[in-house]
Amino acid sequence: MTIAVGQEAPDFELPNQFGEKVSLSSFRGKKNVVVVFFPFAFTGTCTGELCALRDDLSVFQNDNVELLAISCDAMFTQKVFAEKEGYNFPLLSDFWPHGAVAQKYGVFNADRGLALRGTFVIDKSGIVRWTVVNSPAEARNLADYKTALASL
């Protein structure tokens, strides 16, 4: 079951594309967090969505907001993906145990071994304030993210 608005966001600690551990709780009391689960690196829709975030990064990564993009790809895949596309935000690897964080958020497709396109806007106190889950083939609308962030 997907984490709902008003619930506390499950904490996690995952390696970023450089092998550094990143935890959700490290932002508590400091920044709102946008957690973006994506199915696979190097695929058309995922690349398009993350490039749109990259191109409008000041909205999603600033003194008040942290952007964390998560897939079940290996850390080394995330590193090459970030380098190729010029992503200057954390790409976190939910590779092992495979999809454990995506499962906590209710966005893991066990049959396909991937994270669905789940987005969670989490406030500074760790509460989910907005969420949407799309199918793997359906791109998300970044304008919705901006509206959700503006309401915090």
PLM features per residue range, with description:
Residues M1-L152:
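Chalcogenol-based redox active-site neighborhoods
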